C-alpha cells in the first residue's frame, strides 16, 4: 500500500513537472475524467500542448494560454464514430455540425460505396453526387483526402474502401461471378486503396450492387487488404430471416482471409425472430473462442435507414437505374415483383425490408428528390399510399419512378430488447450509422433518421443515466478506445499523456438526444466542449468554426506493406 502511495505521488509530481517544463496551451481543470479504458473515473486536470496531451493529474499550480473549468462536468476521449456516412456531406459543410455537437471527434467512413475509387465501368447511376449537385472531381482516396484537407474539416476522418465501389469499377452494374482477370483487377484496386490510407474492406450486402458480390470475391478482396494489416467491416447480407447465415458468412470471410471482422449495426430485423439476440451473440462469441477476431457495433434505436428501393428484389436492379425503372413499368413483371416484395423469395437469402417491418406502416420516407412529392417527407408509407389513393404496389412504383429509383427510408424493424442485449456485450461497440447534417443551410433538408443528431448523447442520457443499461465508464469505452482499436488507431481513444488531444467534455447529469422521428433536425444537449487535435471546436455548446481535422490511417501494421 505504501509503495503504491509513493508511486502515485511520484506520478503526480512528474505530471506537474512535465506541464511546467513544456508549457501548456490548454488546461482542463477539475473535471471527472473517464479515460476511455473502462477503468473507474477520477477527478483531475488535463494539460494540452499543441495537439497532444502532455500531463494529467492535479495541476493546480500550472498555467495555460486557455483554461476550461470542467467542474461538475465529465471529461472523456473524443467519440470515434465507427460507422458514419459523411463521405460527401463533408464537402458541403466541413464543420460536421450534428456530429461535433454529439461529441464526435473522428468519423469512420466508406461502408460499401466509398469515396474511391471512381471510374472504370461505373455509370452515372452508380456514382454518388455531392449533395446539392456536383460530381466528384477526384478518382482515388489520395485525391479525395486532399480535397477534404484543402477545404478543412472539423473532425478527423478515416475510410474503408467499399467492396461495392470496387465491384462497379470493374464490372459495372452486373451480377454474376467475376472472371479471373476481373478478380485480379479488384485485388489491385484494394491494394492501391490500402496504400493510399484505407483501413480495410467494407461491404453492404443487403442490396445491389453489394448483394451481387459472392463470398469468394469478398475473401479475395480482404486477403488483398490483409497484406497491409486491414480489417473487414460488413453490413451483412441479411439482418432478417437469414441473419444467422449472414453472421456465419462474415465469420467465414474473416477466418479465410485472415482479417479482423466488425459487423455493422448488429440487429435482428424480422418481427418473427425478435428475442433471438442471445443466440446470435452466442454464435459470435463461439467464433471468438476459436480465434476469429470478430466484433460488432450497434446504434441505440429500433429503426434503421436504407432505401425504399431495397424492397425490390435484386434481379430488378441489374443494369442501373434506367433498367430498374423500366422493369417497374413493365406490366408483365408486376405480378412477380408484387409476390416477391410481399412474401420474399423462397429459398433465397435476400433481405426483404417489407417482411422485416411487417407492413407499410413500418416505413417512414426521409427525402424525395422530385418537388411534386416533397410533401410526403416524414410520412409513413401507409399514409402516402392512402394519400395517393391507389393500390400499395402502384404507389410504391410511382414513388420510385418519379424520384430516380431512390427514396431514402427509415424502417422500423428490430426490437428494443434485442438492441439492449447487444449493447451490453463487451465486444460490441457503438456507432451512429449517421451523417453529419445541420439544422440550417443546405444540409437541413429532408427528414433524416434521428441518429444523425443524437446517437452518442442518447446512449449517455437514456441507457446510462436513466435506464442503467451500461455504466458511464463502459459506455465511454465503447465509443472511444474500443473503436480506435478496431481500426488500428493507436494514439486516440484514451486520455493519457502522449496521446492526441481529442477530448469531449459533457454534463453527464443533463446530456440527452433531442432529435425524434417526427422532428429530427434538433441538436443534442449537454455536450459543452469538443477539442480536436488540441483545438477547441465546440465552446460552451457553440461551434467555433475551427477545422483542425486530419486524415487518420492505420498505425497497427507498423507501416510495413507485407
Question: Where do the protein language model's features map onto the residues?
Answer:
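Bacterial N-terminal signal peptides
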Residues: 5-15
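C-terminal cap of metal-dependent C-N hydrolases
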Residues: 31, 421-427, 433, 437, ...
Amino acid at each position: 500500500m505504501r509503495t503504491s502511495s509513493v508511486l502515485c505521488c511520484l506520478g503526480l509530481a512528474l505530471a506537474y513537472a512535465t506541464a511546467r517544463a513544456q508549457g501548456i496551451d490548454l488546461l482542463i481543470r477539475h473535471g471527472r475524467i473517464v479515460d476511455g479504458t473502462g477503468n473507474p473515473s477520477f477527478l483531475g486536470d488535463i494539460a494540452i500542448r499543441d495537439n497532444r496531451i502532455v500531463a494529467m493529474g492535479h495541476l493546480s499550480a500550472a498555467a495555460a494560454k486557455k483554461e476550461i473549468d470542467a467542474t461538475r462536468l465529465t471529461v472523456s476521449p473524443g467519440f470515434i464514430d465507427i460507422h458514419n456516412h459523411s463521405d460527401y456531406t463533408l464537402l458541403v459543410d466541413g464543420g460536421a455540425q450534428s456530429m461535433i455537437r454529439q461529441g464526435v471527434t473522428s468519423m469512420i467512413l466508406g461502408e460499401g460505396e466509398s469515396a474511391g475509387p471512381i471510374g472504370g465501368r461505373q455509370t452515372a447511376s452508380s456514382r454518388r453526387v455531392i449533395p446539392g449537385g456536383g460530381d466528384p472531381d477526384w478518382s482515388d482516396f489520395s485525391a479525395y483526402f486532399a480535397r477534404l484537407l484543402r477545404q478543412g474539416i472539423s473532425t478527423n476522418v478515416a475510410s474503408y474502401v467499399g467492396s461495392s465501389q470496387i465491384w462497379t469499377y470493374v464490372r459495372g452494374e452486373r451480377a454474376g461471378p467475376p472472371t479471373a482477370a476481373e478478380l485480379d483487377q479488384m485485388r489491385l484496386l484494394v491494394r492501391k486503396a490500402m496504400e493510399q490510407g484505407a483501413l480495410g474492406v467494407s461491404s453492404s450486402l443487403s442490396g445491389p450492387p453489394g448483394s451481387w458480390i459472392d463470398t469468394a470475391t469478398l475473401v479475395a478482396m480482404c486477403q488483398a487488404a490483409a497484406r497491409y494489416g486491414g480489417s473487414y467491416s460488413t453490413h451483412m447480407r441479411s439482418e432478417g430471416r437469414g441473419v444467422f447465415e449472414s453472421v456465419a458468412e462474415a465469420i467465414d470471410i474473416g477466418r479465410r482471409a485472415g482479417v479482423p471482422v466488425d459487423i455493422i449495426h448488429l440487429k435482428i430485423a424480422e418481427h418473427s425472430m425478435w428475442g433471438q439476440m442471445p443466440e446470435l451473440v452466442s454464435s459470435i462469441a463461439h467464433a471468438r473462442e476459436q480465434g476469429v477476431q470478430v466484433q460488432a457495433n450497434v446504434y441505440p434505436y429500433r429503426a434503421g435507414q436504407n432505401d425504399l428501393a431495397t424492397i425490390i428484389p435484386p434481379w430488378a436492379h441489374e443494369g442501373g437505374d434506367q433498367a430498374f425503372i423500366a422493369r417497374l413499368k413493365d406490366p408483365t413483371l408486376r405480378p412477380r415483383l408484387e409476390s416477391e416484395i410481399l412474401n420474399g423469395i423462397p429459398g433465397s437469402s435476400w433481405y426483404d425490408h417489407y417482411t422485416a417491418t411487417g407492413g407499410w406502416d413500418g416505413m417512414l420516407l426521409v427525402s424525395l428528390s422530385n418537388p411534386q412529392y416533397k410533401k410526403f417527407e416524414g410520412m409513413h408509407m401507409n399514409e402516402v399510399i392512402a394519400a395517393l389513393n391507389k393500390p400499395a404496389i402502384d404507389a410504391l412504383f410511382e414513388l420510385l419512378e418519379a424520384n430516380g429509383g431512390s427514396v431514402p427510408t427509415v424502417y422500423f424493424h428490430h426490437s428494443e430488447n434485442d438492441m439492449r442485449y447487444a449493447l451490453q456485450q463487451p465486444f460490441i461497440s457503438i456507432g451512429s450509422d449517421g451523417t453529419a447534417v445541420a439544422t440550417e443551410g443546405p444540409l437541413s433538408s429532408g427528414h433524416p433518421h434521428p441518429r444523425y443528431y443524437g446517437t452518442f448523447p442518447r446512449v449517455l442520457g437514456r441507457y446510462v443515466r436513466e435506464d442503467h443499461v451500461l455504466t458511464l465508464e463502459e459506455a465511454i469505452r465503447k465509443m472511444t478506445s474500443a473503436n480506435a482499436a478496431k481500426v488500428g488507431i493507436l494514439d486516440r481513444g484514451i486520455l493519457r499523456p502522449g496521446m492526441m488531444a481529442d477530448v469531449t467534455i459533457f454534463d453527464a447529469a443533463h446530456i440527452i438526444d433531442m432529435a425524434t422521428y417526427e422532428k429530427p433536425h434538433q441538436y443534442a444537449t449537454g455536450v459543452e466542449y469538443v477539442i480536436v487535435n488540441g483545438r477547441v471546436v465546440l465552446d460552451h455548446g457553440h461551434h467555433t468554426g475551427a477545422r483542425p481535422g486530419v486524415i487518420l490511417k492505420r498505425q497497427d501494421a507498423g507501416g510495413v506493406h507485407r
